[in-house]
């Protein structure tokens, strides 16, 4: 068995100074049991922990590492910026214009864009902007969709909130909750009903076009187009939260994959290349309401800092130069087929959902199309599965309700190893 002595010691020490011993709840292994693994190094598709154990990484820092960890072009660009430019000035820099222009070129909905420091900042800012633009207060989100830890979004949220078994959080006021309406993912009638019941009061509908924090749930054919039409008919701002799926499922994000253009888009993860970053953008007539041009306030001390922009710019350039998407699709499809074959051999019929290089194996036989069906998954079995995979050197998300990310650095040999480990882990999970 792998030894995790130093990780256990570090976790005990961390709990003295950090709430729960972690800086993000899902990292605490509450959902799967056991002690969090402390990582010491990441290279390519591999992580090494503080006890010297090596793992194939399918978490990818929760999505940013589509090119693997420590890509040589990105590290070289960061080294140049550190040595020759600096870390932050609190002033405009030329690089801000370069990345903004590139994002507007790549993402269909973007005519103007504002850089921020996280996905949460991006979604909070986009919702504030939608409210300012429309003069309305209420928003519609979808049960299980996670849009960061802003108060407006912690109502039937996904990801860590699902892991805790508490979809909302103390500290979110009743007034805030009343302004956040929840619809059922992939159910347009549930959205229409809320719009009708709150006529002329809905500022925005915000959605993950590929839900990635309730496992992975793709939008059904026509669902996003129906939302687009509904928003057009009712003067509602349509926001695509592409913090996770943006630049992951396609270069132009899910909106280019599905051919539906929102009014506003939020981004993060991949556009930071592993450093903290976020962005929101969209139609010029809406974005012109953002201060200092308009009256909707948004600001950030470190927004647009050279380090984060360097990593993001180089990542985008590599994605454009190398077009890894066909190869990512091939690799992710190999894993999906391998897992399916394993389940057939074992007489299992668990659900797999996948869009491009983001996927999820749900420990349920119920088709997963919404929050309600996602939570039929057996988290006890997932916990056993997770620890068996970990023991075999495969690092997955320590939660049933997160995505598995394939990167361009995963080799065919890595995929074979993962499929073999999956066969063993499925047997243990179901024993």
From Swiss-Prot:
Keywords of this entry: Chlorophyll biosynthesis, Cytoplasm, Isomerase, Porphyrin biosynthesis, Pyridoxal phosphate
Family matches, as PROSITE patterns: AA_TRANSFER_CLASS_3
A GO MF label: pyridoxal phosphate binding
InterPro entries linked to this entry: 4pyrrol_synth_GluAld_NH2Trfase, Aminotrans_3, Aminotrans_3_PPA_site, PyrdxlP-dep_Trfase, PyrdxlP-dep_Trfase_major, PyrdxlP-dep_Trfase_small
Highest taxon of source: Bacteria
Xref: CDD domains: OAT_like
This enzyme's EC code(s): 5.4.3.8
Keyword Phosphoprotein listed: no
Known cofactor(s): pyridoxal 5'-phosphate
GO CC annotation, single: cytoplasm
Main location: cytoplasm
Catalytic reaction list: (S)-4-amino-5-oxopentanoate = 5-aminolevulinate
Residue numbers carrying N6-(pyridoxal phosphate)lysine: 269
Subunit-level organization: Homodimer.
Family to which this protein belongs: Belongs to the class-III pyridoxal-phosphate-dependent aminotransferase family. HemL subfamily.
Name of this protein: Glutamate-1-semialdehyde 2,1-aminomutase
Species of origin: Chlorobium phaeobacteroides (strain DSM 266 / SMG 266 / 2430)
Lineage: Bacteria, Pseudomonadati, Chlorobiota, Chlorobiia, Chlorobiales
